[in-house]
């Protein structure tokens, strides 16, 4: 791993290619280039967003920002970058061996890269590898189950200030990192890892909470954590930041599951897809007045819902290959019949409605789209940063 543990320095801007997590801080947008690093975009003028740098961080999928320090995964490490001057980002620190998303083999080291090819491998039910997500073959090839390989590390404001006076950025609903006060919360497929940022450039892994398999997203709201999984939504009491305790689990059919919370209502999107092994495409509206006993209020049929955001009484929804949609959610019974707007023609998987601005930032396979949402029924496209293949 030493070759990946070099000081990270900004490089010239790159073209977007394989976009992932989306993050907003001050007048800047941070876009994950899956497995490669982070694009920094000056968004002072949303009609003319300007890429200004690329941070090459191998193995990166996730990020969070607190007090001008960017925290990002770098394979099995957590790295810290000083972004006080986004044009001159400085490497600030590293905490080693705190993530286990990559398999370690005693004779070979960490598996961090592979070239993919499609092949059908038949196993008998008595084979020791039957039921495993991945395994090595005798000829040295590594075999992944198709569902597992499609579920690599994915994927709440412009700046807000928490009760401790810390400036925290704004993440999308597919986020797997979340910063609350002086703690960074990170989810893997099965646990929650809590980093103490008392020394902000030397983050300490302070606590690990086992949750269960299929964990996908984390959304903090007030003193609670709402954790989306492929089988439901976990609600945790986070009044003790190092020891979150489970209050409840709202279950649903197996499907991909981001969560957004406003007031006493949680909005959960379910979608089909290989990695989810499900066939539901819907928006669930859940009453969380009693956090220990969440109750389904309604399910609304959607096309292929992904990330979402709520502003006032409007739902901003990324509907996969069907584009970007806006719904009136003032009456939970009527959401599906109250579509206010539909912007087709591009793929959308996550959205941030920027705090204090009539601005929606949407990320997808086609690139980064920005919309003026001063009239929710008529979102106006301001700009596009397209991926290199589009």
Feature-to-residue mapping (PLM):
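Feature marking well-ordered beta-strand scaffolds used for ligand recognition
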Residues: 1-390
């Amino acid at each position: 791993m030493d070759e990946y543990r070099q000081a990270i320095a900004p490089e010239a801007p790159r073209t977007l290619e394989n976009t992932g997590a989306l993050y907003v801080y001050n007048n800047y947008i941070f876009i994950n280039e899956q497995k490669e690093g982070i694009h920094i975009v000056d968004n002072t003028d949303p009609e003319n967003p300007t890429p200004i740098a690329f941070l090459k961080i191998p193995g990166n999928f996730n990020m969070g920002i607190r007090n001008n320090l960017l925290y990002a995964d770098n394979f099995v490490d957590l790295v810290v970058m000083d972004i006080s001057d986004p044009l001159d980002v400085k490497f600030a620190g590293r905490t080693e061996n705190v993530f286990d998303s990559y398999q370690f083999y005693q004779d070979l080291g960490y598996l961090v890269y592979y070239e993919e090819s499609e092949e059908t491998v038949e196993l008998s039910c008595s084979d020791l590898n039957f039921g495993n997500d991945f395994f090595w073959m005798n000829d040295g090839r590594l075999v992944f189950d198709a569902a597992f390989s499609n579920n690599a590390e994915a994927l709440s404001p412009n700046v807000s200030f928490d009760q401790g006076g810390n400036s925290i950025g704004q993440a999308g609903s597919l986020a797997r990192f979340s910063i609350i006060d002086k703690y960074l919360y990170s989810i893997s497929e099965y646990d929650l890892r809590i980093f103490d940022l008392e020394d902000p450039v030397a983050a300490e892994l302070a606590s690990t909470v086992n949750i269960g398999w299929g964990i996908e997203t984390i959304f903090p709201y007030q003193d609670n954590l709402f954790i989306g999984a492929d089988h439901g939504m976990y609600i945790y009491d986070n009044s003790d930041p190092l020891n979150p305790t489970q209050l409840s689990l709202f279950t649903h059919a197996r499907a991909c599951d981001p969560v957004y919370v406003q007031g006493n209502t949680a909005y959960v999107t379910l979608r089909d897809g290989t990695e989810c092994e499900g066939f539901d495409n819907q928006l669930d509206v859940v009453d969380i007045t009693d956090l220990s006993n969440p109750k389904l209020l309604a399910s609304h049929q959607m096309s292929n819902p992904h990330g979402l955001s709520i502003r006032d009484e409007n739902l901003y929804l990324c509907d996969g290959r069907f584009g970007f949609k806006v719904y009136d959610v003032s009456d939970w019974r009527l959401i599906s019949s109250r579509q206010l707007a539909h912007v087709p023609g591009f793929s959308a998987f996550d959205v941030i409605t920027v705090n204090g601005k009539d601005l929606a930032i949407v990320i997808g396979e086609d690139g980064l789209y920005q919309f003026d949402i001063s009239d929710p029924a008529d979102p106006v496209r301001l700009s596009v940063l397209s991926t290199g293949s589009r």
